[in-house]
Amino acid sequence: MAPAVATWAPGLWRACNALMAAFFALAAVVQVNDPDAELWVVVYMIPAVLTLLVGFNPLVTGNFIWKSVSAIHMLFCALWAGGLAYHFLLHAKQNLLNEEEGRELSGLVIVTAWMALCHSSSKNPGGGRMHLAIAVVITLLPLLSWVYVHMNKEMRSSWPTHCKTVI
């Protein structure tokens, strides 16, 4: 007999998707005064919309168009993250979150990880326990990172001007 899906699991999956959609939308909004804002707004708005759709209807991850857009976006973000990681390894002077490229790399990794998690949920839209545990960790990661960065005055002092004037 197959184990029954916990009654709270679909609600938790939807809540994680709602929080991640809000995070991605906020990440897009704070790019407004970045020198390459148009690129980063697209990078964050695509997963914001795709994630919002999953929050409304978890079965959308089985849709061909949703799967295609998410797969292409994941590939693009993974390749870009690889290039940034290589650059960061060669030129890093400080902690990952102190460097703009490090924060960009973190954003791309979060986008790729979340989209991969959503992409894999098409077989079990409610999510299994491990799937939900990973979802909760990924959902908390950006929130905790932003709190850490915004509370750390030393880190904020090294930011470029366009990062200091957004929020």
UniProtKB/Swiss-Prot annotation:
The keyword Endoplasmic reticulum does not apply. Keywords: Membrane, Transmembrane, Transmembrane helix. It comes from the Eukaryota. The keyword Disulfide bond does not apply. GO terms for cellular component: membrane. It is found in: Membrane. Pfam families: TMEM220. It is a multi-pass membrane protein. PANTHER family: TRANSMEMBRANE PROTEIN 220. This is Transmembrane protein 220.
